[in-house]
């Protein structure tokens, strides 16, 4: 997809992920083994021991990050292309085993000259179930593989979810601490995080949602992950998808040259 000098590559067959985002020929998303931006659904981050409850029923998910289950079931699956144009792609995925409920995920990726807007929804036509939506981008720490100044992160969260030794929130909210981070933060007025590559580009990640995970412990990448709830949220803060009320979320990456 193209808009002005912005170009985005979408990979329906590889988890419905954004494979690359180039602005003026400069790649903003990490390439290689962990790359692009993948959707996290029907949960974000880790579920404790891979188990979540829906009423009296306990469901077990595969432990793909032992001892926990991480990042949902769709990031390696093949999505269907419902519609595509020069600057917008609409993808769908029907939830299947190991997720215990039937439902449909729809993702819309829309490119403008100065922004990329991501929208996702989860619908059910049968049983209600808890779910989460999020995105996991791998932004390049430095642009063009250079040795210049790395991306600087600026945001003003209201709190930080205290992280336990098991990498999951303890349930305590604490004052935000300095990085490096692999942590979830609360932004009750909406997510607003700015990445700045000094002298090159500023990219602002915004969303009406209230939780964002910031992960900058890797040398080559910085992750800013908007999501509809905290890690382990299927257990601690479930949001129900019902036949009358789908779960919906949106996030925007807007950039400007410096």
State what each model feature region is.
Residues 63-113:
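Extended, loop-rich substrate-binding clefts of extracytoplasmic carbohydrate-active enzymes
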Residues 128-130, 137-208:
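Active-site/ligand-binding surface loops and adjacent short beta/alpha elements
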Residues 201-258:
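Active-site pocket scaffolds in enzymes
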Residues 80, 106-108, 183, 236-242:
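Beta-strand-rich interaction surfaces with strong enrichment in secreted/lumenal proteins
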């Amino acid at each position: 997809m193209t808009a002005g000098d912005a170009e985005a590559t979408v990979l329906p067959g590889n988890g419905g992920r954004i494979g690359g985002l180039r602005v003026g020929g400069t790649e903003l998303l990490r390439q290689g083994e962990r790359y692009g931006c993948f959707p996290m659904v029907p949960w974000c981050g880790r579920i404790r021991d891979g188990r979540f409850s829906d009423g009296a029923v306990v469901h077990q998910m595969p432990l793909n990050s032992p001892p926990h289950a991480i990042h949902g079931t769709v990031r390696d699956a093949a999505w269907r292309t419902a519609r595509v144009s020069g600057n917008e792609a609409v993808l769908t995925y029907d939830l299947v085993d190991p997720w215990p409920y039937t439902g449909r995920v729809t993702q819309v990726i829309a490119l403008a000259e100065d922004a990329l807007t991501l929208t996702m929804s989860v619908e059910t036509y049968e049983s209600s179930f808890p779910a989460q939506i999020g995105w996991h981008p791998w932004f390049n720490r430095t642009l063009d593989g250079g040795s210049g100044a790395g991306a600087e992160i600026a945001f003003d969260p209201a709190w930080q979810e205290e992280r336990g030794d098991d990498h999951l929130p303890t349930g305590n909210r604490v004052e935000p601490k300095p990085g490096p981070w692999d942590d979830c933060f609360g932004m009750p007025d909406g997510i607003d995080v700015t990445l700045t590559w000094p002298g090159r580009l500023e990219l602002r990640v915004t969303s009406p949602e209230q939780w964002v995970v910031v992960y900058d412990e890797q040398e080559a990448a910085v992750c800013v992950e908007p999501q509809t709830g905290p890690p382990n949220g299927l257990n601690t803060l479930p949001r129900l998808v019902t036949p009358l009320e789908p779960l919906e979320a949106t996030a925007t990456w807007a950039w400007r040259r410096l």
